[in-house]
UniProtKB/Swiss-Prot annotation:
The gene is cro. Residues 15-34 bind DNA. This is Regulatory protein cro. Keywords: DNA-binding, Early protein, Repressor, Transcription, Transcription regulation. SUPFAM superfamilies: lambda repressor-like DNA-binding domains. GO terms for molecular function: DNA binding. It comes from the Viruses. Cro represses genes normally expressed in early phage development and is necessary for the late stage of lytic growth. It does this by binding to the OL and OR operators regions normally used by the repressor protein for lysogenic maintenance.
Length: 73
């Protein structure tokens, strides 16, 4: 799973740039890359929008029940 976060960082350039774009601390990005914790649904959605869909929210935050949310929207 950490591979997708490494690819996300590569997309933005650095962990600092990724953090700035996504509105989180650099230490949060480091935690994703190191597999310490996952990404929140809110940040996953933000990443999908900012990357024009290159990174899917479902892939960035697979534990969240996206299909349930879309069924009620």
């Amino acid at each position: 799973m950490t591979t997708i976060y490494k690819e996300l960082v590569a997309h933005f350039g650095t962990q600092d740039e990724t953090a700035a774009k996504l509105g989180v601390d650099q230490s949060t990005v480091s935690g994703w890359v190191r597999g310490k914790h996952g990404m929140s649904p809110v940040v996953a959605k933000r990443a999908q929008v900012l990357t024009d869909g290159k990174f899917k929210k479902e892939d960035l935050c697979p534990a969240f029940p996206w299909e349930v949310l879309s069924a009620v929207a």
